[in-house]
Amino acid sequence: MEVSELPLDARLIAVLKERGVGRLFPPQVEAVRAGIFDGRSVLLCTATASGKSLLAEVAAVKAGLEGRMALYAVPLKALAYEKLVHFSYYRGLVKVGVSTGDFDSDDRRLHEFDVVVVTYEKLDSLLRHRPNWLGLVGVVVVDEIHYLGDPRRGPVLESIVAKLRHLGLKTQFIGLSATVGNAGEVAAWLGARLVESSWRPVPLREGVYHGGVIRFSDGSMQRVNAPGDAEVALAVDAVAGGGQALVFTNSRSSTVRLAKAVAKAMEAAGLVPRGAKALAEEVLKASSSKIIGRELADLVARGVAFHNAGLELEVRRLVEDGFRRGLLKVVVSTTTLAAGVNLPARRVVVADYERFDPALGREEIPVLEYRQMAGRAGRPGLDPYGEAVLVARSKGEAEYLMERYVRGQVEGVRSHILAEPNLRAHVLGAVGGGYAKSLDDLVDFFSNTLGAAQMKTSLKLSILRSKIGGVVEELVEWGFLERDGDFVYATELGRQVARLYLDPEVAAGYIRLIKSLRAGNVPAYLYVVLTAPDFPRVRRGRADKRVVEGILAALDVEEDEEFEDLARTASMLMAWIEEVDEDVIYEKFDVAPGDLRVYVDLFQWLGNAAAKLARLVGREEHGKRLEVVTARVVYGVREELLGLVTSLRGVGRVRARTLYNFGYRTLEDIARATVREIASLPGFGEKLAESVIEQARQMLAEGLRGEV
């Protein structure tokens, strides 16, 4: 089928042709015949690089051109910004926006956009706020819909579908995934037509490596002559053959170790590419850690990189872009980042099929996850084939890996929404958002979830009612709901908890701790916010004595193992807001720049939520001070610098401290300065000095005077 045959606006067809899209792939033709451009709901379960995302983008833009809105939901912030770049092709046709944060907002200005890219959680949060523009939504796309089986994100997706059904919106639903074991069941639940295909633009060969040989599933064998450990040999062999390699391993330390080993082997084999030095300089400049930045930049200059959650988003993007441009020949990534790494390579090497889970110990990765990694093999237009290779340590393990992963069936997604913690949050969300006013309403609401669809029993409704009733009683006990017979109402506190997108149990814990505070101090406020299980616990380093004393002076808490972990984590953040050098923090507490960013982002949400809860329960002073502590965590500064970092673009914690120490402490001080004076300060150049002075003068002209 030719693109010109599609039932699309001529302008949209012209953009597709400009992108080099002339003929559709077979799975795309199936999707068109299933009605993806006729408003039909469709579940696309087709191989990586088969063009499903392109169709979803076009359907979203088509809706915009027809005067309707489209929401494009993705599981990760990183994917949201990547998708925004994809939509830039259509910027002459539609306005595209992105919304990933601030759950306590209805984002009423989003109606100004034709297409909005959102994270799952942000979309669910928007549906709880029920902004007026929801009636304009004509298309909802859910990328990576296999996340329905994720214990945390799956219930969010189910809740989104239940809310859309309750609102009665005539919305076209488009689900995308390369890997859903029970696609028919999911499509039936969604009321969508299923398009399922294993067709790929580049043939995929899957096999297992052991003893210097790759044994492929079709019975063929390939000897690998490159020296070194299995993972290194497989990567270097791919590069020697003119390809690129993507290696997945199970820990951050392994990504660094293997990347160094690959770089050394590539040097020995004379395979170091040219042209990556400029990229290495960009990596060094973008990294907030001089130590990690230098370590990574040294590898990048030799055509290799590690890629893990410890790296900042900007650094990860530089690595990904360098790989796509061919400047990097090998990237070694953690298996946990496989979903967010959209990097095709001739050879994908799965070095570890087990990983460590703090709660479960060592566990095997699911077949679904292996398929996600294997799907990256083969660059359309560049590679004649793609290879996905698992590494075995013994002959017996090689046979096991072949049966379990290469020949194995992808697991079906199973719902987790009826598990008590998830049910609790989504019951409150349904009542607080106005989707249910009685137990009967709640039963109806949750009857629309995949969890209900997967309950194969005639007692389904009575089981649902019993589960929901128990959760309602708990929410009443915490003061979030009130019950009058069968009727259920959200209290003002409950509505706010739902709007803040808080786990009710976390909110109840925050309220209890805030009410019990004997005195307010920074360590105690850090401790309160960090009690949410969303925060990873810092396991290394020693808790600051002053932090421990501050917590114990304000709260009656037991000094157990959990307390020690929380006190250590609070100590790490205390060092951050006391402006300790970042590399010192990373080394002392064994955290990385990407970890710190996670803490900061979470604290911005949960710290502000705790401040609002404090005010709602009559603890105004604690609310004010929690807001200040949260702002300090967001910017990593002492309190006296908050005005500077919040007022001036281009001025972070280091430059703000420089300004302050050199006597530029107010907007007036900066506005009176000359460009030469500011430009002479460490970390400032002429261009930034001009910008900072202009910003200060403009703010003063608008009436923002005094201490900042």
From Swiss-Prot:
Residue ranges of every copy of the Helicase ATP-binding domain listed in the record: 33-198
PROSITE patterns registered for this protein in UniProt: HELICASE_ATP_BIND_1, HELICASE_CTER
Keyword ATP-binding: yes
Entry keywords, A to Z: ATP-binding, DNA damage, DNA repair, DNA-binding, Helicase, Hydrolase, Isomerase, Nucleotide-binding
Helicase C-terminal domain ranges (all copies): 231-429
CDD domains per UniProt: DEXHc_archSki2, SF2_C_Ski2
Enzyme's top EC category: isomerase
SMART domains: DEXDc, HELICc, HhH1
Function: DNA-dependent ATPase and 3'-5' DNA helicase that may be involved in repair of stalled replication forks.
Subunit note: Monomer.
Protein name: ATP-dependent DNA helicase Hel308
Organism for this UniProt entry: Pyrobaculum calidifontis (strain DSM 21063 / JCM 11548 / VA1)
Lineage, top ranks: Archaea, Thermoproteota, Thermoprotei, Thermoproteales, Thermoproteaceae
